[in-house]
Structure formats: structure tokens, C-alpha cells
């Protein structure tokens, strides 16, 4: 059996993936990988090298600190261990190509992965909370959007979710009381969406035509739309601590930016 030691100043996932990818090119080999992670001092490196020297094997390492990388290489030689640097040559070449120096901060890839999984978790939550689904989970949302149909609740929710926010949206339907769970949410997390009546009529009419349905029904009737918006306003007035955003003629990006600005600054217009 051959032993391979994986030395890293972070989690060791990067060096292990590279080595495992290379090993797939070799069939029927008996290899054992030993991961030595978070080696950020000379003492850490020396202890790990002493451990590796007990059952010698080749060392592959990814240390972004040049001094530590050189120390590892020298100390490995003293112990008659072969050590191969997987990242320093790449960093030097990229620095030359890009014209800037690397940050040399351990664990950045792991941090990026953590941010990615946070966004995916937010997206998963948001999909499950779309259009008033699972109101029992409203209290878990970072942001709760409320408004009548076709005020961009779903597109806004998904846009914010991809920025890492868990978002729920609740439709406000005239004559139907919103779920009681909505009123148990921290008021500062709730955003009411408003829109110009004629603009909403135009959006709904276009929607009906796209679905090949009659655009002359009550769904796109101006008087009916005005009544729905009045219903919204009454609910918003009962909850003055909610943020209210006018989405008329705004892109999803613009509306999302305003929502986040309000949240970050605590401004209430």
C-alpha cells in the first residue's frame, strides 16, 4: 500500500480533489490518503511531518503562504520525505498573467463554497414558500413579501434568494384574511408591494392574452383592480411598521435594491 499525505492550510478539500482526480487515471492501485489540514504555523507543519515520517509516503501540499510552503519543503527533505507543491507554481503563473498579487489567504475556496450553499439553501426555502405555501414557516423567512397578484412577488423572491435571503411571499386576495402566521412575523421583515392601478391592469391583460384567456374578465378590470389595491392599503395601514414599496415601472433588480436599501438603513418612506 502506498501512502499519500495531503497538507493544507485550510480544510484540505482542494488538494484532496486534485489528487483523487489524478488517481482516477490509475486502475487497481492500493493507496491510502492522509489529510493534514489547517497547518498555519511552523509547529503545525513540523508535527504533521513527524507523523508522516513514521509511515513514509509522498506529500502533496497547498499552502498559500510562501514562507510556510518553503519551510515545509525544506523540513520534508530533512526527513527524506518527497513533498510536491501543487499551488505555488500556479499562483505565480496567475499573478504574472493577471498582473496582480494573490491574496494568500487560506480557506477562500471553502468560504466561497459556504456562500454558495447558503444561497442554495435560501433558494430552496424560497421555492417552498412561494405564493403563500407553508405559512407555518413564515417566521423563518428573512423577508416576507405581500401584495396582490402580478406585483412581481415571485420574481422578487427568487432574485433576493439568489443573494442569500430566505424569502416568503404571501398573496393578498380581496375579501380573504391573510394567514394568521403573517402577523406573527417580525414587522421589520415584512414588505408590502404596491403598484399603479392602470399599470397593473396592463400587466394582467398581457398575462391573460399570453394564456389565451379573455382579457375582459374581472381579473384585469380597472375598477376591480382599484378595489384590490384599496384592500391592500387598508391592510398596510393596520401595520404601519411594514415597509411599503411601489414597484410601478420598476425592474425586479430596482425593486430588490430598494428593499435591501430599506433593510440595511432602516429607512421607512
UniProtKB/Swiss-Prot annotation:
Catalytic reactions on record: N(tele)-phospho-L-histidyl/L-threonyl-[pyruvate, phosphate dikinase] + ADP = N(tele)-phospho-L-histidyl/O-phospho-L-threonyl-[pyruvate, phosphate dikinase] + AMP + H(+); N(tele)-phospho-L-histidyl/O-phospho-L-threonyl-[pyruvate, phosphate dikinase] + phosphate + H(+) = N(tele)-phospho-L-histidyl/L-threonyl-[pyruvate, phosphate dikinase] + diphosphate
GO MF annotation list: ADP binding; ATP binding; phosphotransferase activity, phosphate group as acceptor; protein serine/threonine kinase activity
One Pfam family this sequence matches: Kinase-PPPase
Keywords tagged on the record: Kinase, Nucleotide-binding, Serine/threonine-protein kinase, Transferase
Top enzyme class: transferase
Binding annotation for ADP: 147-154
EC number: 2.7.11.32, 2.7.4.27
InterPro entries hit by this protein: Kinase-pyrophosphorylase, PPDK_reg
Record-stated family: Belongs to the pyruvate, phosphate/water dikinase regulatory protein family. PDRP subfamily.
PANTHER family assigned: PYRUVATE, PHOSPHATE DIKINASE REGULATORY PROTEIN 1, CHLOROPLASTIC (PTHR31756:SF3)
Protein role: Bifunctional serine/threonine kinase and phosphorylase involved in the regulation of the pyruvate, phosphate dikinase (PPDK) by catalyzing its phosphorylation/dephosphorylation.
HAMAP family the record matches: PDRP
Protein name: Putative pyruvate, phosphate dikinase regulatory protein
